[in-house]
Amino acid sequence: MAIEIGAVLALAAARHSDRVGALLFSDRVEHVIRPAKGRGHALRVIRDLLAFAPRGRGTNLAEALRYATKLLRQRAVVVVISDFRAEGWDEPLARLANKHDVVAITIDDPRETILPDAGWVELEDAETGRRVLVDTGHEDTRGRVRQAAERALQERQKKLIRAGVDRVSLHTHIPYALPLRRAFAERARRLKR
């Protein structure tokens, strides 16, 4: 979903004659496409998004944000697409927002917060590879997971607000086109005032 959103935003930037670039990362910055104008450049961004195969394991959003802050010399609109589940990203995001106009697009998957009643299930952390056996047959287990997820989402929201960035919340089970269009239209109206 993040790749699709990146592609949509790249084409929108090209259509408005805005520069577009990308910074792709895992546990380290792996690929940088410097901002430039034009449909051809936007298509290159999309091609690189589609072809990106991270070499690293895990996510270091904080390092990517620090890199972006150093990379961008002129004030720019920076869109950060992430689930923001990594640690330590809030200060680097606030620093980036001090120099640039930042939009944080959060992507959440309800399957990560609502466990089905499926008995014993082995869960694997996609970033660390750590596995754990969980008995999802108990309501209290499912409730604890749900409550922990809700607390994490609330904490993420507080950090994004403190960083002073615009926020767009998307969900994997809901088509993103309309919420994304509405969010950017509202943002444009607000910035015109």
Model region roles, listed by residue range:
Residues M1-R193:
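Exposed, interaction-prone extracellular/peripheral surfaces
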